[in-house]
Amino acid sequence: AFIEAHRPELARVVLELHLEHAAAEHVARDGAVVPTGQPEARWWFTSRLPRLEAAVRGAVEAEKLERSFVVPPTIFGPQPTTDGGFFHLEGVPLVNFLTAPFYLFDAMDTLDKIHRASLVPVTRAAVRIVESTAGVSAAAMRGEADGQTSVRGAGPLGLRPRKRGGS
């Protein structure tokens, strides 16, 4: 509904940043679900834009967010499986952070499953990523698509080659 109502404004959006989950890793042990003390693997679904990918990698490293993967939004198919997926299909640059614990959306998915030690560094990483866009226009951000851009109706992975030169 939001995209339909605001589609003309999407071209002016420099970055769509989504923070979904900061989950603690839990495993089944002796018939119980117990915490390991580690965060779940962290997924940073990031549009294939060199400037943005570098900003995310830099933020992850600076905040020592181990167990992080910086991956394209289309890694699992043309429709990203994240909250930001619909923005990606509209060509809006995206960073979507999440973890995907086995208990997600289950009755056992309770507040005690938050990896509290991740909250501050993930927040700081998000701030670093947003700060990396200072002075960057939406057009400039999209123009760095490393030969590929994501748009509605694009190729098999939601990608198509960027036009080069006069052709």
Language model region names:
Residues 99-167:
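His/Asp/Glu-rich mid-to-C-terminal helical/loop segments that flank catalytic regions of hydrolases
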